[in-house]
């Protein structure tokens, strides 16, 4: 969606959902997945793909593009993992239930004029900031990482559910992580290398093309 009003509505609906979910404490025996360990695993996958490409005598179109850009994405991933580790070690993060896949496809506008989250199959114990980061990332990718879009989403969320300094730092670290690049790398790593999907090549080329806009946003958003 490109409508600011729609994005604001989705963001408010997410905040309302988080307000409800945090009323239900997690059982003491439930383990919450480590965010920094997850980020480190994804960084390791980038390095693994890089090493695979280095061993090849001839690279294809995807591998050529990957090798052009992997260093800066890997650097972002490592920095994100470092911040996530710092936050998790501080013991200040409060886990609760999360939607798990909150994007424009999982929030609907009802006939009564309300925005409601749907499709809760992916709900899991975690940190609510991960839902907000996923929603912001999806919307920013569709809007050239426009700071006005980011501000609109964040302001709408905070009008319903406030974020303290720790939550903001977590959100920033999650947005810093090169999630889309890792997703493309993982898809390629699990595919047949003898046949390169043109769609993957196009997606990576587009990601590189838009990386300047993303980095400009991160420059002002990450403190």
Name every feature range the model reports, one short phrase each:
Residues 7-10, 39, 66, 70, ...:
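Hydrophobic packing residues in well-ordered alpha-helices of helical domains and bundles
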Residues 129-162, 175-194:
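Active-site activation/catalytic loop segments of kinase-like enzymes and analogous catalytic loops
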Residues 182-223:
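ATP/Mg2+ or Mg2+-diphosphate-binding catalytic cores
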Residues 1, 19, 23, 47-59, ...:
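A glycine-centered beta->alpha junction motif in the catalytic cores
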Residues 1-29:
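ATP-binding pocket architecture of kinase catalytic cores
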Residues 81-130:
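Active-site acidic catalytic loop and adjacent metal/ATP-binding pocket
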Residues 27-97:
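ATP-dependent phospho-/nucleotidyl transfer catalytic cores
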């Amino acid at each position: 969606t490109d409508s600011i009003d729609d994005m604001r509505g989705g963001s408010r609906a997410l905040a309302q959902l988080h307000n409800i979910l945090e009323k239900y404490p997690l059982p003491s025996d439930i383990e919450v997945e480590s965010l920094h360990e997850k980020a480190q695993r994804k960084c390791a996958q980038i390095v693994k793909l890089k090493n695979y490409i280095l061993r090849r005598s001839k690279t294809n179109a995807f591998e050529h593009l990957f090798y052009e850009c992997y260093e800066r994405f890997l650097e972002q991933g490592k920095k994100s993992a470092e911040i996530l580790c710092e936050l998790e070690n501080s013991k200040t993060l409060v886990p609760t239930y999360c939607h798990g896949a909150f994007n424009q496809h999982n929030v609907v506008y009802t006939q009564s004029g309300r925005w409601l989250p749907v499709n809760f199959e992916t709900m899991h114990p975690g940190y609510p900031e991960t839902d907000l980061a996923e929603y912001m990332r999806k919307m920013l990718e569709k809007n050239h990482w426009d700071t006005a879009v980011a501000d609109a989403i964040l302001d709408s969320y905070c009008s319903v559910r406030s974020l303290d300094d720790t939550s903001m730092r977590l959100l920033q670290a999650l947005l810093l992580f090169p999630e889309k690049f890792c997703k493309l790398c993982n898809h390629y790593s699990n595919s047949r290398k003898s046949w390169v999907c043109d769609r993957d090549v196009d997606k990576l080329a587009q990601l590189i093309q838009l990386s300047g806009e993303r980095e400009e946003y991160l420059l002002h958003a990450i403190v």
